[in-house]
C-alpha cells in the first residue's frame, strides 16, 4: 500500500497541530512553527473555510494521525456506521485498535510509523503468534509482545523509556521487563486525543 514518505513535520504544520508523527525525543514545536502553513513564508488566505472544507481537513488530519489512506479509511467508516453506538466514537475505536497503533500506545515504537515497521518486519507477536499485519484489529484480552530476538533493538528500548516517562494509556497494561502488554479494552472517547472532532467526519460522509 502506498504511503506518504515526505517530511512528517510538514503534515503537522498543514493541520496546525502536532499529529505525533515524529518521535517525542524533541518537541515538534522546537522544530517548526505549527501556526505557520508549509511554504516559504507560510500560505495565507483571507477566505473563510467552508463547512465542507472544515470537514475535509478534519478527515485528512485523522487519516494522517493513524497513517491510513482513503480507501481503507472509508472501510473503517462503513464498519463504524454499521456498529451500534456513536459512529464517530466507533471510528476512533477501530483506528485505536489497529495493531500498529496498539504497539505504539504500549510504547514499543516511538511513533505509529515506527510501530508499523516493527509489525511489518515481524518483530511483534499477538497471543504468541507473529503478526505482520499493521491493520489487524486487536481485541480485549489480547497479549502483544516483542519477539525475543528483537528485544535488544535500541529503538525499542528508547521508545519504551520515553513511553514510561510520558505515561501509558489506562486501557493497556504493559510489563516493560517482559516486553509485552495486554489490550485491556477498547479506549473510551475520553481516553483519545481531545483535539479530534469526529463529528465533522460523520457529517462529511453523511453528505
UniProtKB/Swiss-Prot annotation:
The keyword rRNA-binding applies. It comes from the Bacteria. CDD domains: S4. GO terms for molecular function: rRNA binding; structural constituent of ribosome. SMART domains: Ribosomal_S4, S4. Residues 31-55 are annotated as: Disordered. InterPro entries: Ribosomal_uS4, Ribosomal_uS4_bac-type, Ribosomal_uS4_CS, Ribosomal_uS4_N, S4_RNA-bd, S4_RNA-bd_sf. The keyword Transmembrane helix does not apply. Coiled coil: none annotated. This is Small ribosomal subunit protein uS4. It comes from Paraburkholderia xenovorans (strain LB400).
Amino acid at each position: 500500500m502506498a504511503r506518504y514518505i515526505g517530511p512528517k513535520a510538514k503534515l503537522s504544520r498543514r493541520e496546525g497541530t502536532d499529529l505525533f508523527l515524529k518521535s517525542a525525543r524533541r518537541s515538534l514545536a522546537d522544530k517548526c512553527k505549527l501556526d505557520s502553513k508549509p511554504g516559504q513564508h507560510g500560505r495565507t488566505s483571507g477566505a473563510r473555510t467552508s463547512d465542507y472544507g472544515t470537514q475535509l481537513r478534519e478527515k485528512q488530519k485523522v487519516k494522517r494521525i493513524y497513517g491510513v489512506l482513503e480507501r481503507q479509511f472509508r472501510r473503517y467508516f462503513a464498519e463504524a456506521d454499521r456498529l451500534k453506538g456513536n459512529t464517530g466514537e466507533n471510528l476512533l475505536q477501530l483506528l485505536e485498535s489497529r495493531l500498529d497503533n496498539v504497539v505504539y500506545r504500549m510504547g514499543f515504537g516511538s511513533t505509529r510509523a515506527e510501530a508499523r515497521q516493527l509489525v511489518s518486519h515481524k518483530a511483534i507477536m499477538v497471543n504468541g503468534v507473529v503478526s505482520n499485519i499493521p491493520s489487524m484489529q486487536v481485541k480485549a484480552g489480547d497479549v502483544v509482545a516483542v519477539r525475543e530476538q528483537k528485544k535488544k533493538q535500541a529503538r525499542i528500548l528508547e521508545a519504551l523509556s520515553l513511553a514510561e516517562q510520558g505515561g501509558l494509556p489506562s486501557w493497556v497494561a504493559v510489563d516493560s521487563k517482559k516486553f509485552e502488554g495486554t489490550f485491556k479494552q477498547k479506549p473510551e472517547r475520553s481516553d483519545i486525543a481531545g483535539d479530534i472532532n469526529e463529528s465533522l467526519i460523520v457529517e462529511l460522509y453523511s453528505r
